[in-house]
Amino acid sequence: MLDAERAGAGASPEDVGEAGAGDAPTLPIALGGETGASAALKIGSAIAPAVLLAACGGGGGGSTPTPTASTPVVVTPAAITATQASRFLAQTTMGATRAMIDTVISRRYEGWIDDQFALPRATSHWDWLNANGYNVAANINSETGFDATMWRQMIVEPDQLRQRIGMALLDMLVVGIGGVNLNWKQFATAAYVDVLLDNAFGNYRTLMGAITTNAAMGSFLTFLGNRKANASTGAQPDENYARELMQLFTLGLYQLNMDGSVKTNGGTPLETYGPADVSGLARVFTGLSLASNVNTTPDRYRQPLVMNASINETGSATFLGTTVSGGGTAAVDKALDTIFAHPNIAPFVSKQLIQRLVTSNPSPAYVGRVASVFANNGSGTRGDLKAVIKAILLDTEARSDDALTGTTAGKLREPVMRLTAWARLAKINSASNAWAFGDTSSQSTRLAQSMGRSGSVFNFFRPGYAPPATGISNAGLVAPEFQITNEQSVVAYVNYMQGLVANGTGDMKPDYSDLTAKASDSAALVDEINLVLAAGQLSSATVTAIRAAVDSVATNATNAATNRVGIALLLTLASPDFLTQR
């Protein structure tokens, strides 16, 4: 956790204790004397907050000195260690595996990234839903199948960098299935996620066009079938998409320098746009409609929206200092070109991608280096996401071991990423293709997050969120993922993972064969879990505590290997060291 993040997330002093920024996290253990996997993994709700929030006392907000070069500072160590490889994979995949660690060591960082760029998508979400029979009349008003295809791709598909970037984009360019007011909504939302994944290594301008003509986005942000102004009734075009496209997807509320800092005039932030810009841009996004009226199959939700001239505004529209006229797709293209050319887009998008992959509080120099690559990939191309991804992941602030000790480095690991990290370690699969994790967005029983299920365009957490009245906010830092972190969600997470670690769910049973082979040696067992699951970030105190818990189960006890592995896994998953991605 960021040292400043140790102020907690809405926890009272009684919950978080007295731990300071320099204190090692404590791992209270109350496993009881029962035998069997489930019994050995019992951690009650009273313990969970202590496990996860014990290290959330006050903390300072210092900073780590960073290079000020205007171009990315690439770290190329003579040899990559297994720990460094695992840390890299924590930023670039949905979870490390032993095999991938070895591949990164062999191919090195940039070689591994290039290999991932070259991988085709094995199966689209849309095609998987079709192949598994979800395109039947019984599912016309259903979400059935959506969660299954999402979990499957995140956990087992080999294009792990694409999956990670796609989920980062879904956190930024939000569509949630519950707000998609279409039939066949599982197909419509799957088609949207496919757009993000298909364009994850493309150009951001192309991606802007693809989401603008996507049916699920059109429904979610209410511009599908948006009508031009009606002089008789006074009705005006829906402004939702025009506003969120600028505010959340491209530019932000305030004018930015290339390093992401806000431009001011006399101390007052300069706004990027005003109400007139929103109204003008909304006139452009009229007329976009479904390509077909056939609703007996989901096919029309995969097709790009088309222009319905009868409801499209063909008069002039002024926004961001530009005026377009004539309507149609030409006006849409010019509007998107205008936004894409705005100086804000490079730092705005770059900073959010850094936050999703590497650290919640990147230095201005880091943001500036990545933004410069967004603005120009070195060959005159703007918005080249491959170049931006490399700039983020190969920068010294991402790769240097110094980041491990910086007081503002790192981020709270998203709940979904915690589950997928365990699932990939445990070789989770579903022979039936049911992928029974389902919707995990419940704060009281699951993860408080489920990809593609945000209830709002503002996502489960905002990029600028800081827990109020904490060391984080006092230090001027942010911790987005803390917006869904509280006593209830912490307990729910530990309890949910307890069941999964012990038993899996449905036909998804964990394969711990690699770990049970080490179960009799607590040092070897915890070292392996520390490396693959936690990227070597468990402190010596945490390792000692987990080993003690493991050794409380005698090696000759009933189900000893299973119980020892389960204890080590659950306590790692519950430790602040794992919950922090550095």
Residue spans of the language-model regions?
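Sec-dependent bacterial lipoprotein signal peptides
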Residues: 1-9, 14, 18, 25-54
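Flexible, low-complexity segments enriched for small/polar residues
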Residues: 86, 90-93, 134, 173, ...
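N-terminal mature-domain "stem" immediately C-terminal to a signal peptide or N-terminal signal-anchor/transmembrane
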Residues: 74-122
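Short, contiguous, well-structured surface segments enriched in hydrophobic/aromatic residues
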Residues: 159-162, 173-178
